[in-house]
Amino acid sequence: MFGAICAGRLVQTNLQQVADNQFVFQLDSAESLNHIVVFLLPNSPFPVGMGAKVYFQWPGKPFQFLGYLTNEKPSAIFRLKNTIQTLSENENCVGITAMLGISVEPLTNFTETPAVSTSASNVIAKPLPPVTSVAQKILTNLYNFLASFATSQLPPNSIGLGDLRPNDTFIPLRVFQDWHAKFLNKLSNNPNFLDSEDQI
């Protein structure tokens, strides 16, 4: 009924049913996980009025609510990178096996679950960044890309518009078109790529 993919790994095939409406995936070497995708398998929709809550658990810790799936939202990406802060500093953080829990419940139960279930897990459900922050990241990405193609020489057979000064810089329109295509491709492959964007 469910599938899961940890970023950089193969599809998880170790789903176990632990109760009539509860399932778990065992996640080996969980300390290296950043993101996980959870999804409904094709041709296995929820019964009408049902959905699934998704949880994450470190060994010896309570389950932490990540989000949910429904027939209208059959897949979701969850950020796990900073959940390791819930472990004690004295615990060995290498080779840890964590659990991904899925609980099938009536949709009416979904309004009762907070975005984050414990104070120790305050970094799981990441809020959307402000529009100005996203715009700044996009413009920085664009500037860095265009600057790498800037030239002080007007390309051959080009006609300058307006007054040209000796220190003017030129960027071919093709470069902007290339950036736009590459940006959209990156965005479709990873909607969160701007969060760690240090590259062109």
Swiss-Prot record:
Lineage: superkingdom: Eukaryota
Pfam hit, one: Hikeshi-like_C
One GO-annotated biological process of the protein: protein import into nucleus
GO CC term (a single one): nucleus
Compartments reported by the entry: Cytoplasm; Nucleus envelope
Record carries keyword Cytoplasm: yes
Keyword Cytoplasm among UniProt keywords: yes
Name this protein carries in UniProt: Protein OPI10 homolog
Biological source species: Schizosaccharomyces pombe (strain 972 / ATCC 24843) (Fission yeast)
Organism lineage string: Eukaryota, Fungi, Dikarya, Ascomycota, Taphrinomycotina
